[in-house]
Amino acid sequence: KFPVEDKKGAKYEDHQCSSYDVEVCPWSNIPDEDFALADDHHWTIGQFVWTGFDYLGEPSPYDTDSWPNHSSMFGIIDLASLPKDRYYLYRSVWNKEAETLHILPHWTWPGREGEVTPIFVYTNYPTAELFINGKSYGKQSKNNSSLKNRYRLMWMDTKYEPGEVKVVAYDKNGKAVAEKVVRTAGKPHHIELVSNRNELTADGKDLAYVTVKVVDKDGNLCPTDNRQINFSVKGTGKYRAAANGDPTNLEQFHLPKMHAFNGMLTAILQAG
């Protein structure tokens, strides 16, 4: 959501919320506050997050007069078991052993050309440099000037132009150690299926979760394509359900069809 501003209980005409993780429910706070408490006070023993996984019910801040909102929006992972942007913020702080380098938002914004579109980076590395179409927008390093600056790298004044966003991360010694690229999507070309498992036990119970993406000819996610996708299964397995993570979507999970949400959804298959 633009402009990117700290807000409590913000509501929008599309009944969605911002992925920049600067908006919270009236009773909540940004994750950075909890991170700082844990880092600054030896007496803390952990963090309580409400909630790790979206669920049906309690669609705050759309609690009243907000049909068709019917599921929570503040989870780290959405109702389709897909990680949200904030998942990578938590991961960058909680998991110091694994590399995290995540760019948000996506970079397919037809009609926003020339408009301010901030870029956030969630990473376990202390510093990163941002490039848009080959032009450097400088390095940012985590610092103590604000809560968000302690845990995020933020370029607040960048303007949208179609093309490529690249981030190069640097370790504490100033060595370039990782990079990530996000590109503007072209026209939708095909459907990409990625299963979390290659084999199932033939017990009639085992499940596979298949991430479904609408992508362009180069494999870039098409985040504005929300077409309906129909499912059928050949062989001894069977289709069980699908979800797209949209808190306003009323399609039934068990039917073999579902609209994508931001170009994605999850389908569940069961062994025969």
Regions found by a protein language model. Name each.
Residues 160-164, 205-207, 262:
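Extracellular Ig-like/FN3 beta-sandwich strand-entry sites
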Residues 1-176:
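Extended substrate-binding grooves/exosites of carbohydrate-active enzymes
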Residues 140-142, 188-193, 231-248:
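Short aromatic-acidic-glycine turn motif
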Residues 109-114, 199-208:
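Short, solvent-exposed loop/linker segments at the N-terminal edge
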Residues 174-186:
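Edge beta-strands of extracellular beta-sandwich domains
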Residues 119-123, 168-169, 205-223:
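Beta-strand-rich structural segments
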Residues 153-160, 252-272:
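Short, hydrophobic beta-strand segments
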Residues 185-203:
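Low-complexity, acidic Ser/Thr/Pro/Gly-rich terminal tails and inter-domain linkers that flank the onset
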